[in-house]
C-alpha cells in the first residue's frame, strides 16, 4: 500500500514539475523557444531581423532615429521609444538619454508635458529627473 502511494506521489510530482518548467520556459523565452527574454512575439513586436529590414528600407532623407525608426530633421529631435513613461534628457555634449519618468503622488503630473518636462529639476537627488541626469553627468551632488 505504501509503495503504491509513493509511486502515485512521485508521478504527481513529476507531472507538476514538467508543467512548471514548461510554464517558466514560455515566460522567459517568449514562448517561441528562442530566448526572447520575456518578450512575446505578437502582432505588435518585430523580430530583430524584421526591425533591421525596416530600418534599412526606411525612406528617410534626413535622420532616422535608431530607437524608434522615426524620420526627423536631426538626432536631437528623436523621441524616446516610450514617451508616455520616459523623459528625454539632454546631456551637456548635445546627446540625449531617455530615462523613466519620476512617479509618485504629486510628482508625476509635473512631467506629463513633453515640451517642458526635460526642463524640470526637482533639485532633489532622490528624484531621478533631467536635473539629476545633468548633475550625474557633471559628477555633482546637491549640497544639503
From Swiss-Prot:
Residues 1-18 form the signal peptide. InterPro entries: LCL2. Keywords: Signal. The keyword Signal applies. The keyword Lipid metabolism does not apply. GO terms for biological process: ERAD pathway. Probable component of the endoplasmic reticulum-associated degradation (ERAD) pathway. PANTHER family: LONG CHRONOLOGICAL LIFESPAN PROTEIN 2. Belongs to the LCL2 family. This is Long chronological lifespan protein 2. It comes from Lodderomyces elongisporus (strain ATCC 11503 / CBS 2605 / JCM 1781 / NBRC 1676 / NRRL YB-4239). The gene is LCL2.
Amino acid at each position: 500500500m505504501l509503495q503504491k502511494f509513493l509511486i502515485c506521489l512521485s508521478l504527481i510530482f513529476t507531472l507538476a514539475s514538467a508543467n512548471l518548467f514548461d510554464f517558466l520556459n514560455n515566460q522567459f523565452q517568449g514562448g517561441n523557444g528562442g530566448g526572447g527574454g520575456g518578450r512575446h512575439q505578437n502582432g505588435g513586436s518585430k523580430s530583430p531581423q524584421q526591425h533591421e529590414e525596416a530600418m534599412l528600407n526606411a525612406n528617410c532623407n534626413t535622420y532616422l532615429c535608431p530607437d524608434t525608426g522615426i524620420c526627423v530633421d536631426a538626432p536631437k529631435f528623436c523621441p524616446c521609444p516610450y514617451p508616455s513613461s520616459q523623459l528625454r534628457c539632454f546631456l551637456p555634449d548635445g546627446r540625449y538619454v531617455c530615462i523613466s519618468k519620476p512617479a509618485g503622488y504629486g510628482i508625476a503630473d509635473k512631467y506629463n508635458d513633453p515640451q517642458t518636462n526635460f526642463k524640470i529639476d526637482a533639485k532633489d537627488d532622490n528624484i531621478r529627473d533631467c536635473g539629476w541626469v545633468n548633475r550625474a553627468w557633471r559628477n555633482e551632488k546637491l549640497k544639503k
